[in-house]
């Protein structure tokens, strides 16, 4: 059984139950890089969002035919579970606004990363703000 990224198993011996755990990447919450048939047929209303984008809407952002010639991209951050620099959102906003409107910025307070960038079929997670890596990811995936 997986619990919060841990594999948990119980063994009963002589009336006692012993639990074993091991770390696993299975079960992590990260932005989607594709979409399912059940995704929402809507895109975020604006490029810079102060509220989280619903998961099924995030999936539609990954759909190549979602109103853009190319697949859109998500730049998301989690300042609830991770300690963020006071100006992190401001710096991410500055980066995103230098790209076309199909690059979206939003908080994602339940993801298992401080910063995550998602494009169709691609994902980059960062523990610290790296403007060069973020710009490169967006540029490299803009024409795919």
Model segments located where?
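Surface-exposed, low-hydrophobicity interaction/linker segments
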Residues: 20-63
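Mature extracytoplasmic domains of secretory-pathway proteins
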Residues: 57-105
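Helix-rich interaction surfaces within compact, conserved domain-sized segments
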Residues: 95-144
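Functionally engaged cysteine thiol sites
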Residues: 37-39, 79, 111
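Hydrophobic membrane-insertion alpha-helices, especially the h-region
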Residues: 2-18
């Amino acid at each position: 059984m997986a619990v919060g990224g841990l594999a948990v198993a119980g063994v009963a011996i002589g009336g006692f139950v012993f639990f074993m755990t091991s770390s696993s990447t299975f079960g992590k919450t990260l932005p989607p890089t594709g979409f399912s048939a059940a995704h929402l047929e809507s895109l975020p209303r604006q490029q810079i969002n102060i509220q989280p984008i619903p998961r099924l809407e995030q999936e539609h952002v990954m759909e190549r035919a979602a109103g853009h010639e190319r697949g859109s991209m998500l730049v998301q951050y989690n300042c609830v579970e991770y300690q963020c620099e006071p100006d992190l959102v401001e710096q991410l906003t500055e980066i995103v606004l230098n790209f076309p409107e199909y690059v979206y910025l939003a908080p994602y307070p339940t993801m298992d990363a401080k910063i995550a960038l998602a494009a169709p079929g691609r994902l980059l997670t960062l523990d610290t703000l790296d403007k060069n890596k973020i710009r490169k990811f967006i540029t490299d995936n803009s024409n795919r």
